[in-house]
């Protein structure tokens, strides 16, 4: 390990996303895996992180003890669950470690905690680290400006059977991007289910539909429908590696920041488009 290499830690190292992150770190120049963590009592504790990720032995042992490894990493990458992420967030604030947060499903209190922590440490917090998805979010702003005021807007998302939150964080980010452009509050205009006799559609609403099936990595489509035509803007992920690569590149970008809350628009300079 070179003294100039950025040292990254992965939480949930044995999960689907954790293994992809370890692979992405292994493939990216200028970064190295410094530590790998799993939840207490996990059967994977003690395993070699590289062997878990399918890249061979790398000499990094999976542990549940962040404190024991605090000197081994500069930035922590967390794609786990809200309660775990908030615990890791408190640790990173105490020890002044940057964070990449890809966890979704936070309530308002959780989001406030992240905002508060960003006053002390640098954080990239995004619902989706794919370059393509974040380009789609920018395109949705453009579409909403042109068609949003007179179109029926629906967002359809699909994920694998194991995803525990719905709608996905990316679908909500799409809705928020559209609503903000139109001067609406998503909490007031979102419709998450339609059952029974619903009556006519509220023209100001943004509808969400969720599919959970098989091994779908992630698919999102925003529909702007008018009489006689509709525009659909879609993104389909075929591998989690696109999210992992985005997270690792975000960590490299974040390493130059002292504190603050950032998203992928900042990392990719999308506001300049």
Swiss-Prot record:
Enzyme class, spelled out = oxidoreductase
Q: Which GO terms describe its biological process?
A: diaminopimelate biosynthetic process; lysine biosynthetic process via diaminopimelate
Listed PROSITE patterns: DAPB
Similarity comment text for this entry: Belongs to the DapB family.
Alphabetized, the UniProt keywords read: Amino-acid biosynthesis, Cytoplasm, Diaminopimelate biosynthesis, Lysine biosynthesis, NAD, NADP, Oxidoreductase
Q: Where does NAD(+) bind?
A: 12-17, 38, 102-104, 126-129
Q: Binding positions for (S)-2,3,4,5-tetrahydrodipicolinate?
A: 160, 169-170
Q: Which residues of the sequence carry a binding annotation for NADP(+)?
A: 39
Q: Which residues form the active site?
A: 159 (proton donor/acceptor), 163 (proton donor)
Q: Which GO terms describe its cellular component?
A: cytosol
Tell me the compartments it is located in: Cytoplasm
- Extract the InterPro entries matched here: DapB_C (IPR022663), DapB_N (IPR000846), DapB_N_CS (IPR022664), DHDPR_bac (IPR023940), NAD(P)-bd_dom_sf (IPR036291)
Q: Give the NCBIfam families listed for this entry.
A: dapB
Enzyme Commission number(s) of this protein: 1.17.1.8
Q: Which Pfam families match?
A: DapB_C (PF05173), DapB_N (PF01113)
Q: What is its main location?
A: cytoplasm
This protein's species is Proteus mirabilis (strain HI4320)
Recall the taxonomic lineage recorded for the source organism: Bacteria, Pseudomonadati, Pseudomonadota, Gammaproteobacteria, Enterobacterales
- Domain of life according to the entry: Bacteria
According to the UniProt entry, its GO molecular function terms are:
4-hydroxy-tetrahydrodipicolinate reductase; NAD binding; NADP binding; oxidoreductase activity, acting on CH or CH2 groups, NAD or NADP as acceptor
Q: How does it assemble?
A: Homotetramer.
Q: Which reaction does it catalyse?
A: (S)-2,3,4,5-tetrahydrodipicolinate + NAD(+) + H2O = (2S,4S)-4-hydroxy-2,3,4,5-tetrahydrodipicolinate + NADH + H(+); (S)-2,3,4,5-tetrahydrodipicolinate + NADP(+) + H2O = (2S,4S)-4-hydroxy-2,3,4,5-tetrahydrodipicolinate + NADPH + H(+)
Q: Report what the protein is called.
A: 4-hydroxy-tetrahydrodipicolinate reductase
Record pathway: Amino-acid biosynthesis; L-lysine biosynthesis via DAP pathway; (S)-tetrahydrodipicolinate from L-aspartate: step 4/4
């Amino acid at each position: 390990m070179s003294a100039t290499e950025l040292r990254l830690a992965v939480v949930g190292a044995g999960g689907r996303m954790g293994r992809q992150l370890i692979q992405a770190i292994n493939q990216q120049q200028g970064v190295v895996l410094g530590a790998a963590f799993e939840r207490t009592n996990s059967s994977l504790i003690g395993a070699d992180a590289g062997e878990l990720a399918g890249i061979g032995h790398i000499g990094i042992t999976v542990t549940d003890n962040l404190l024991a490894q605090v000197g081994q990493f500069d930035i922590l990458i967390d794609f786990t669950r809200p309660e775990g992420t908030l615990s890791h967030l408190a640790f990173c604030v105490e020890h002044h470690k940057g964070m990449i947060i890809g966890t979704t499903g936070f309530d308002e209190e959780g989001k406030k905690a992240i905002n508060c922590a960003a006053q002390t440490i640098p954080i990239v917090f995004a619902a989706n680290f794919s370059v393509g998805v974040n380009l789609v979010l920018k395109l949705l702003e453009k579409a909403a400006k042109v068609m949003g005021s007179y179109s029926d807007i629906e967002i359809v998302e699909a994920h694998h059977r194991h995803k525990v939150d719905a709608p996905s964080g990316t679908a909500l980010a799409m809705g928020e991007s559209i609503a903000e452009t139109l001067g609406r509050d998503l909490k007031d205009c979102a419709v998450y289910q339609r059952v029974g006799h619903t009556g006519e559609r509220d023209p100001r609403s943004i509808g969400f539909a969720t599919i959970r099936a098989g091994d779908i990595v992630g698919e999102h489509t925003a529909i702007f429908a008018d009489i006689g035509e509709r525009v659909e803007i879609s993104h389909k992920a075929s591998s989690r590696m696109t999210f992992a690569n985005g997270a690792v590149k975000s960590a490299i970008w974040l390493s130059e920041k002292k504190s603050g809350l950032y998203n992928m628009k900042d990392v990719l300079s999308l506001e300049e488009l």
